Structures are given as structure tokens and as C-alpha cells.
Amino acid sequence: EDAHKIFDQLKSNNKLKEKICIMGRSLGSAPTLELCAKRSDITGCVLESGYADPIPLVERRGLKIDKTTPEENALFNNSQKIRLVKCPLLIMHGADDFLISPHEAKLNFDNAGSKIKHLEILEGVGHNDMMMQHSYFTTLKRFFDSL
């Protein structure tokens, strides 16, 4: 909800005029997908080190979640929400990410509703060092140039 309010405020103030690409990293992938799934005025979506399903992610940290409501699942389950994303999509993930497995990036990619979608698994990259790779910026530039 907050992401929509901020986006609407920026649009109403003419701060967002041309092509708009929304990017979310790690837990920020959830509000990114929330926007991209529900808005038609977004040109592109980038997910960096995003999760697919929050339950296994939380349980790997030692917390137990017994039950979620359908509303909670709809809000936080990226692998379901990404089905509604129609804009071009780039998913980037580190092959050595031990916090959020690269398998989750593959799940998101497989479930994505976008007709134009790219999955980039960067070798030798973990969860917090992706920006240090030259290929990171090359990949982003190639995607942005294609929009």
C-alpha cells in the first residue's frame, strides 16, 4: 500500500515523466512486485536477489510459521504475485547467494507473467556483493537499453 502511495505522489508531482523501471533488492522485491503486478504504467521491473516464497526463507532463520491467511500469502508470496507482472522483467541473482537461494530466482522466473523476461545468475556472487561485479552494470544497461 505504501509503495502505491509513494508512486502516485511522484506521478502527481510530475517527478516520473518518461519510462519508469521499478527495482527491488532482497526483501524489497515484495513491494516492487506489488507495484509491477498492479500497474500498467511501469515500463520495466528488476529483481535483485529476490525471494520466491517467504515461508522457507523465514523458517531457515529458525522461526516457525504455522499458518498464513490467504491475504498474507497474496501480499508476501512473490512466486504467486509475479504471475501478474506483464512488463519486461530482469531477475538477477548471485550463484553463491546463501541467504536466498538462486533456486528462488528460477522459481520467480518460471512463474513470471512477463512475455519479455531475463534471468541472470551471476557466478561468484553472493547476496550482498552483486554490485561489485562488472557484469552487474553491463546486465542492467543492456536491460534498460532494451526498454
Which ranges hold each PLM region?
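Alpha/beta-hydrolase active-site loop
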Residues: 1-14
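Acidic catalytic loop of the alpha/beta-hydrolase fold
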Residues: 96-100, 127-129
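Active-site nucleophile loop of the alpha/beta-hydrolase fold
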Residues: 46-56, 77-78
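Catalytic histidine-centered segment of alpha/beta-hydrolase-like enzymes
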Residues: 125-137
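Short alpha-helix in the alpha/beta-hydrolase fold that links the catalytic acid
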Residues: 78, 87, 101-110
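Catalytic histidine neighborhood in serine/cysteine hydrolases
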Residues: 106, 110-128
